[in-house]
């Protein structure tokens, strides 16, 4: 990558700007520039596309996205220490990098959209799941994004793509399965990062289902939270606060079943009966 874009190696950038990763911000910087290119390529063709990136840090993934031809990258970065390093990338790619300093959980992402949008990010571990849920549950659908290519801890990635009767199946699997086609792209070993996390990471690619099963996002979330909050109990017990056996009878679902056995369609049916 250094030869490809003419910018210095990431280790040099991190050392020059004193960018030790902060655990409190969920930071793990990805140093392998071959891997950052692989992540960017997983998102598909980037020419003419605006890419939203969360937590760019020193900019390894940002560089890959720009080198592969994205029209623009809008990078959300909370850590002000990273801004000078990102400014150097912006100078190398004039008018193609906008950096927004702030908390990604408080950003209006739809307002940042400029034409076709893909979200590509090595998400901070401490906010990654909440950001994904926020992107999945807007009232308007199809969403503002064409696809999401995101890195998570492998455990979270398995939950995203899980299906019924899978040990990893839960609220996240239902929400992702309802509105997206999600797939695991590839794993990333701990030694690719600084500092190395204790777990393997994985890249997940999600594309929106244009017309998902009609259902209220808020009600579906309420049903899945109740059902998986006591996942080992029968549904008649775990869904008691929402109507229990009466709700299940209305939806035509056996009250002796457990949450992990229900399909996305059955969860939507329950939500629509509330």
Curated annotation (Swiss-Prot):
Class of this enzyme: transferase
InterPro entries found in the cross-reference section: KsgA/Erm (IPR001737), rRNA_Ade_diMease-like_C (IPR023165), rRNA_Ade_Mease_Trfase_CS (IPR020596), rRNA_Ade_methylase_Trfase_N (IPR020598), rRNA_adenine_dimethylase (IPR011530), SAM-dependent_MTases_sf (IPR029063)
GO-annotated molecular function: 16S rRNA (adenine(1518)-N(6)/adenine(1519)-N(6))-dimethyltransferase activity; RNA binding
Annotated catalysed reactions: adenosine(1518)/adenosine(1519) in 16S rRNA + 4 S-adenosyl-L-methionine = N(6)-dimethyladenosine(1518)/N(6)-dimethyladenosine(1519) in 16S rRNA + 4 S-adenosyl-L-homocysteine + 4 H(+)
Matches recorded under SMART domains: rADc (SM00650)
Alphabetically ordered keywords of this record: Cytoplasm, Methyltransferase, RNA-binding, rRNA processing, S-adenosyl-L-methionine, Transferase
Main location: cytoplasm
SUPFAM superfamilies given in the database record: S-adenosyl-L-methionine-dependent methyltransferases
EC number: 2.1.1.182
GO CC annotations, alphabetized: cytosol
Protein family according to the UniProt entry: Belongs to the class I-like SAM-binding methyltransferase superfamily. rRNA adenine N(6)-methyltransferase family. RsmA subfamily.
HAMAP family reported in the protein's UniProt record: 16SrRNA_methyltr_A (MF_00607)
Protein name (Swiss-Prot/TrEMBL): Ribosomal RNA small subunit methyltransferase A
Lineage: Bacteria, Pseudomonadati, Pseudomonadota, Alphaproteobacteria, Hyphomicrobiales
